[in-house]
């Protein structure tokens, strides 16, 4: 049994996710097991564009962006589950639904968010996942996320 970790740096992440600045919200994948789980990080800095308006006096990362980052992590897990190869052009995983989202504390500049997502089930291109976002080991957000595999015309 191997203890080798499967990682993804930003160069590899860019091959899987269509998101680009300012909406690419995953910096690195620390480990993943196709069909099971993925652990990714987001380094939150004061340079994030959303901090200009949310909120200038007391900067707080918007909860919807924490959920978006979690959805991007589920997309990476879905792609790695489908195949270890880079996806063909025009194949995407769309954020299709969310249930039981809960926010437990704020995320501020200087925090590093750890995303742990687990695949619950997949059927006919629809994946259901459970995810948690943590800062310093404390859960800041949790949710059940659905994503759908789609081919788009280019």
Curated annotation (Swiss-Prot):
**What stretches pass through the bilayer?**
none
This entry's Enzyme Commission designation comes to 4.2.1.59
Reaction equations catalysed: a (3R)-hydroxyacyl-[ACP] = a (2E)-enoyl-[ACP] + H2O
Tell me which GO cellular component terms the UniProt record holds: cytoplasm; membrane
Task: Indicate whether Lipid metabolism appears among the record's keywords.
Answer: yes
Positions of the catalytic residues? 54
Which keywords accompany this UniProt record?
Cytoplasm, Lipid A biosynthesis, Lipid biosynthesis, Lipid metabolism, Lyase
Q: Where in the cell is it found?
A: Cytoplasm
- What's a Gene Ontology MF term here? (3R)-hydroxyacyl-[acyl-carrier-protein] dehydratase activity
GO BP of this protein: fatty acid biosynthetic process; lipid A biosynthetic process
Keyword rRNA-binding among record annotations: no
The protein's matches in Gene3D superfamilies, at most eight in alphabetical order, are given as: Hotdog Thioesterase
Q: Which EC class, in a word? A: lyase
Could you tell me which NCBIfam families the record lists for this protein? Answer: fabZ, PRK00006.1
Listed HAMAP family: FabZ (MF_00406)
Q: What does this protein do?
A: Involved in unsaturated fatty acids biosynthesis. Catalyzes the dehydration of short chain beta-hydroxyacyl-ACPs and long chain saturated and unsaturated beta-hydroxyacyl-ACPs.
Give the family per the record: Belongs to the thioester dehydratase family. FabZ subfamily.
Provide the protein name: 3-hydroxyacyl-[acyl-carrier-protein] dehydratase FabZ
Source organism of the structure? Shewanella sp. (strain MR-4)
Instruction: Name the encoding gene, please.
Output: fabZ
């Amino acid at each position: 049994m191997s203890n080798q970790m499967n990682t993804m740096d930003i160069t590899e992440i860019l091959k899987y996710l269509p998101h680009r600045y300012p909406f690419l919200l995953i910096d690195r994948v620390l480990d993943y097991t196709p069909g099971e789980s993925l652990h990714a990080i987001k380094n939150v800095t004061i340079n994030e564009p959303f901090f200009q308006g949310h909120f200038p006096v007391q900067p707080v990362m918007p909860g919807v962006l924490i959920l978006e980052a979690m959805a991007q992590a589920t997309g990476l897990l879905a792609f790695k589950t489908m195949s270890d190869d880079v996806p063909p052009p025009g194949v995407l995983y769309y954020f299709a639904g969310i249930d039981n989202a809960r926010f437990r504390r704020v995320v501020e500049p200087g925090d590093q968010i750890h995303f742990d997502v687990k695949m619950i089930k997949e059927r006919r291109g629809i994946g259901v996942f459970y995810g948690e976002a943590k800062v310093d080991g404390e859960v800041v957000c949790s949710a059940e996320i659905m994503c759908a595999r789609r081919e788009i015309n280019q």
